[in-house]
Amino acid sequence: MDLKPAHVVVPAAHITRDEVGELFERKGISKEIGNHDPTYLTQWARYSLRQEFIEAEAGMTGCNFGVAATGDCVVCTNEGNADMSTSIPKLHIVSMGIDKVVPNYESLAVFQRLLIRSATGQPSVAFTSQFRKARPGGEMHVILVDNGRSDIIANPVHWRTAKCIRCGACMNTCPVYRRSMGYSYSYFIP
């Protein structure tokens, strides 16, 4: 299966459970041919991923928000994979756009609620993790990505685009996007 992501928050939203089941069968991940039950597939995905996390020398995560006052990196997930990436390997690498920085915890609380409710409609996510330093005996490196963001923020016409928190709400309400899952556009991220 060689598909591009279809959504900024739920990249595999366009893949059916049967397609996932067939992929797991081809890759040897699931053991029961034809069982495409989501709970069964989730269990095998966890088992398979756990083995990879245990053997990894480094884990890499994104960062939903960086808190300027404390230096914390905040990661919100529903699966908990970020915690596996940060707690098992000795090296944790965080990649974060400079537009993800919020001033303090009061601002974080506002943006976190906005992100979660706008992205999936949930009152909260299953996992919110905060990292300020490496785990004992480990290393943590934070990569701040500018990639033209400074120019956008400085531009009097385009600076508002830097306010996007990548929640996907605009995608969820767009009639074209709901039909095409982003494939009508050249890129799936707004």
Model regions: which residues?
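Short, well-ordered loop/turn and helix-capping segments at boundaries between secondary-structure elements
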Residues: 114-117, 176-180
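Ferredoxin-type iron-sulfur electron-transfer modules in oxidoreductases and energy-metabolism complexes
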Residues: 135-161, 177-190
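Short cysteine clusters
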Residues: 164-170, 174
